[in-house]
Amino acid sequence: MGAIAAGIAAGLAAVGAGVGNGLVIGHTLDGMARQPEMSGQLRGTMFLGVGLIEALPILSIVIAFLVMNK
């Protein structure tokens, strides 16, 4: 039962991170198209946001392994 829960948790976290990354990158590209002179600052902010979004699936996999081993 724990393995099923761990798989579902990791899968949903990966889907959520994929959607979040798509939204962040899409809006960053929209901003770069509107204001090309701000592209450097927008790119840096985008990488920070993508890094924070990617922390969610990593943490969920760690928690899933902890739940699976109990």
UniProtKB/Swiss-Prot annotation:
KW Cell membrane (keyword) present: yes
GO cellular component terms given for this protein: plasma membrane; proton-transporting ATP synthase complex; proton-transporting two-sector ATPase complex, proton-transporting domain
Entry keyword annotation includes RNA-binding: no
Site (Reversibly protonated during proton transport): 54
MF GO annotations: lipid binding; proton-transporting ATP synthase activity, rotational mechanism
Location(s) in or outside the cell: Cell membrane
Spans traversing the lipid bilayer: 4-24, 47-67
Membrane-related topology note: Multi-pass membrane protein
PROSITE patterns documented for this protein: ATPASE_C
Gene3D superfamilies noted in UniProt: F1F0 ATP synthase subunit C
Superkingdom as given in the UniProt entry: Bacteria
Protein keywords: ATP synthesis, Cell membrane, CF(0), Hydrogen ion transport, Ion transport, Lipid-binding, Membrane, Transmembrane, Transmembrane helix, Transport
Subunit record text: F-type ATPases have 2 components, F(1) - the catalytic core - and F(0) - the membrane proton channel. F(1) has five subunits: alpha(3), beta(3), gamma(1), delta(1), epsilon(1). F(0) has three main subunits: a(1), b(2) and c(10-14). The alpha and beta chains form an alternating ring which encloses part of the gamma chain. F(1) is attached to F(0) by a central stalk formed by the gamma and epsilon chains, while a peripheral stalk is formed by the delta and b chains.
Function of the protein: F(1)F(0) ATP synthase produces ATP from ADP in the presence of a proton or sodium gradient. F-type ATPases consist of two structural domains, F(1) containing the extramembraneous catalytic core and F(0) containing the membrane proton channel, linked together by a central stalk and a peripheral stalk. During catalysis, ATP synthesis in the catalytic domain of F(1) is coupled via a rotary mechanism of the central stalk subunits to proton translocation.
Entry's family note: Belongs to the ATPase C chain family.
Protein name: ATP synthase subunit c
Source species: Limosilactobacillus fermentum (strain NBRC 3956 / LMG 18251)
Source species taxonomy: Bacteria, Bacillati, Bacillota, Bacilli, Lactobacillales
Gene name of this polypeptide: atpE
